[in-house]
């Protein structure tokens, strides 16, 4: 959550809401956040509970093919993204630890969601191709996030968003899963939305990974060239100064 010290990376809860809906839910959740603060609950606790709820929804319901109810549970706990940020603002806190915890648990939640899909297709869904696609979505999502974090850690801006980032990956997958789950209520043909969504996320994640790798390579080359030019300029300046001293003698 940005208010907890993290850079402006959209969390799942914020990604699922436009600015008007966010303003509405901020007003609604502010009293609840204040209540939790009075009870001595910390933003970190809310973050942990939210992640646990997402994991439960994904790893309990999805492997059984209960996509509708699993998505309902996940969506409810997703709003912890808004609650912990609201609490942090009320407390006036913006910590590196909070940013680190949020980012780390985001990866855990992502893994649980796509892991739940993979477990379903490896079991009751009986489709090893879609199981592999789900695992690819899980792995590629982690690597896409890592490329940006690693690039920034070595001083590069990584100035590219990419075709399908975390918010898009999760919104596409969860909306498709929720709708596909309505097949259990008699809606015909809608179960095919989830496989289509997983393929879209897989291809989009691969494109995004390539975009980020290419961007990091270009920025690294530019940074190395700039550093070399600066070093040459310093050497030339030193040589000119030395020659000037010799001439003065």
Regions found by a protein language model. Give the residues of each.
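Hydrophobic alpha-helical transmembrane segments
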Residues: 4-72, 78, 113-249
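Hydrophobic, well-structured mid-protein blocks that either form specific transmembrane helices
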Residues: 75, 79-127
